[in-house]
């Protein structure tokens, strides 16, 4: 992208690419900006940070989002500051830094309320709900997710609606409310299909696969995992592909195919370590521990179990830690 483009033109191009789910192209466009002043404009940096976050390049995303936040603060731009801290909260969540994430989401929610920004209020509520799920407070999460869903629906934001339904599906699944979880997952897929973004659709399909896996419908779970894998690969979504691998590992282990389960869990963990996803890393260690125990490799199994427990504990992931302890008691 030549350096003599007008800043607003550059922002518009990046915004369109991000909105279309073309995150790799957006990041490539940002890297190609010749003018360093233009490349470091707050809005341009924040859009590039959003693309990097969606691609799982979290270290780059932090650097870009923090740069944008500094510039927004220096010029007293509360709207920009709100969007930047919300994104930094999402990145901190993926890195397992939940106290930082909660602080960022709380700040974003307060700013959104002051600015009467209903969309950001919905996003911040959605993000705070995800923290509540992780910390074992599903009832609190349901209330926040429903508030976010209502706001997204009123605003006509299909991406947000997809994410809220997907998260409701997860929460109902954790509560063993199968019909509600299936209904929410179906709605997530319907809205994701209307958005037309492959990585978002992969996420929604994966949500349904995990529900069916826990319900015991392994054939349907496999079909949905195959679909999610193809979508994530088409989107160039490495982290999404790793999530599919982890679930496919869980399926293989449930069917007694421990070698395949171990291989897939280890491959997914390598991706999680590269991109800094702590929860995914912990879940991969837990899956590897189950596979190794099935193979009779008890010493290695215990090592992976202990590492999974350590990571779950560091996250405050109450439900995940309790489930692991039940399995190994």
PLM features: residue spans?
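Short coil/turn linkers that connect adjacent helices within long alpha-helical scaffolds
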Residues: 34-37, 73-77, 94, 111-117, ...
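Flexible inter-repeat linkers and adjacent short helices
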Residues: 1-85, 109, 314-329
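Conserved alpha-helical positions within TPR/SEL1-like repeat arrays
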Residues: 18-19, 46-54, 79-94, 119-134, ...
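C-terminal non-catalytic interaction modules
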Residues: 1-13, 263, 267-270, 274-329
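Eukaryotic tandem repeat interaction scaffolds
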Residues: 177-277
